[in-house]
Amino acid sequence: MGHRSRPVAQNYSMVPRCQGLEGGHLDNFSVSKALRVDQFTALKGGLVVSCQAPTGTAIDTPAFISAQAQTVVQAGAIGIRAQGIENVRAIKKQVGVPVIGLVKRYLDTSAVYITPLLDDVLELEQAGAEIVAIDATQRLRPNGVTFEKFMEQIREKTDVAILADVDSIESALLAQSLGCDAIATTLSGYTEIAAPELPNIELVAELAAQLKIPVVAEGGYHEREQVAQAFKVGAWTVCVGTAITNPYLLTQHFVNGILES
């Protein structure tokens, strides 16, 4: 996979506008937007860890997930991504770093599974998530709700910071235009849109070059060199999950190596 040969210049001139500094006064929109920007400012240049456990395993409990979060923060993580209302609530009791919360729902009525419902967004905020991750692809949500309508519903109810999980530059540009606060490459390779082998660092570079909001590199990061490359092309922060926090898949990887030898 080809990468850009030089770092991509980042444009975050949106920050002063969000803080309501233009015109010499603060309005309600500017204040709420500034607070959301602050959540991502805290994540700039560091590692976010996705704390998780395979469904149905003995470690799939809020107590374990929160202990896992506490451990990675002690090791230097500056943010946590976590699935599930109770997991988020438990994590917030243990760590002081920003938490990106989401709810995974696998529904028969929609291919969207990352925070597909408005109630999920509101409950995550109530549980303490400073940032809520949502599927920002152009697929329909339950009951035929478009992404545009979903964002409208969210902003009618809450000013919580929204991280848009996307699969393409087109989805990212739409998410930015609808007021999402940052973009993550989480869904690259997980929809019908073709993508190169993960991690999709090329997409990170394209997003960083074209967007005015932070870009979170996520999906398939297993090596330090990959993380460094993502930062080099313009990532605001990098989120790593399985390579750090999934002992089930890591154990399977080594066991399969033994069986295949």
Residue ranges and their predicted role:
Residues A75, Q94, A127, K157, ...:
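Structural motif
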Residues I59-T61, R81-V97, V112-L117, A136-I154, ...:
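Active-site-adjacent beta->alpha loops and helix N-cap segments on the catalytic face
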Residues G2-A9, V15-R17:
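N-terminal amphipathic/hydrophobic targeting modules at extreme N-termini
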Residues Q52-P54, L107, A127-R141, I183-A194, ...:
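Glycine-rich phosphate-binding active-site loops on the catalytic face of alpha/beta enzymes
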